[in-house]
UniProtKB/Swiss-Prot annotation:
Gene designation per UniProt: dapB
Protein name: 4-hydroxy-tetrahydrodipicolinate reductase
Entry-linked PANTHER family: 4-HYDROXY-TETRAHYDRODIPICOLINATE REDUCTASE 1, CHLOROPLASTIC-RELATED, DIHYDRODIPICOLINATE REDUCTASE
Protein's pathway: Amino-acid biosynthesis; L-lysine biosynthesis via DAP pathway; (S)-tetrahydrodipicolinate from L-aspartate: step 4/4
CDD domains on file: DHDPR_N
Major location category of this protein: cytoplasm
Binding site for (S)-2,3,4,5-tetrahydrodipicolinate: H149, G158, T159
Binding site for NADP(+): R35
GO BP terms: diaminopimelate biosynthetic process; lysine biosynthetic process via diaminopimelate
Cell compartments where the protein resides: Cytoplasm
Lineage: Bacteria, Pseudomonadati, Thermodesulfobacteriota, Desulfovibrionia, Desulfovibrionales
Top class in the EC scheme: oxidoreductase
Length: 260
């Protein structure tokens, strides 16, 4: 039995995670956390609940923390978890390179897993897309689009950035040098190596990502569509089960969990 702590338990993702843990045969809801002023009703879950991470984590030693919040909140949580020893599964997106470097430092002290998207399908794409890049060669232009609900605060999505990065690297390019997150006005023709990553926001779309390979006389589109947040929740809980048996030393990702 793996004990789990859900951060942001009353949010869209947190609520889904709580429900999935409650329905699981091998997971136990050890604790839940929310921001001050948002904790009303949490005590009905029958576990440790609170707004102070230090206080909550001290009461549930060894429990795996699952966090889908914000970069600042995640880093604060990691600082506390590195003292209490709780492993942490991170689904937070929108981190800067500097923030990611801090996460890697914390991973030396406590088991940490980080993935912008925890669905099995997206992580299969991370393996498939580089193969397509290599087979098609540089005669095909590469682009990426993503669609998310109108409440998403970061753009482009962490998943789109990760997919585009793996495509760029497969062609021997440095992503930060070729990325194009917007096009506006008379900007001239598309350069040979640039890789556009464009975002659409609206409605209640859980998450669509499409990679484009546009060549002479044809194009290939590879799309992943998430129909439910439960896809991400189950992936995060799969990671939590796995992380509970790991040691600190490296920043783990979904490739480690899936052994691919």
């Amino acid at each position: 039995m793996t004990d789990v702590v859900i951060i942001g338990a009353k949010g869209r993702m947190g609520d889904t995670l709580v429900r999935c843990v409650q329905q699981s045969d091998d997971l136990k809801l050890a604790a839940v956390m929310e921001r001050s002023g948002c904790e009303e009703g949490l005590d009905s879950l029958g576990c440790v609940c609170g707004t102070d991470a230090q206080e909550v984590l001290t009461k549930v030693p060894g429990a795996v923390v699952v966090d889908f919040t914000s970069p600042a909140a995640t880093l604060k949580l990691l600082e506390i978890a590195s003292v209490t020893g709780n492993p942490v599964v991170i689904g937070t997106t929108g981190m800067t390179n500097e923030e990611l470097a801090q996460v890697e430092e914390f991973a030396k002290k406590v088991p940490v897993f980080l993935a912008p998207n925890m669905s099995v399908g997206v992580n299969v794409l991370l393996k498939v897309l580089p193969e397509l890049v290599r087979m098609l060669g540089d005669a095909y232009d590469m682009e990426m689009t993503e669609i998310h609900h109108n409440k998403k605060v970061d753009s482009p999505s962490g998943t789109a950035l990760k997919l585009a990065q793996c495509m760029a690297e497969a062609r021997g390019l440095v992503y930060d040098e070729v990325k194009k997150h917007s096009r506006d006005g008379i900007i001239g023709a598309r350069t040979k190596d640039e890789l556009g990553v464009m975002a659409v926001r609206g409605g209640d779309v859980v998450g669509d990502h499409t990679a484009y390979f546009l060549g002479p006389g044809e194009r290939i589109e590879v799309t992943h569509r998430a129909h439910s947040r439960e896809t991400f929740a189950q992936g995060a809980l799969r990671a939590a089960r796995w992380l509970s048996e790991q040691k600190p030393g490296k920043l783990y990702d979904m490739a480690d969990v899936l052994d691919v």
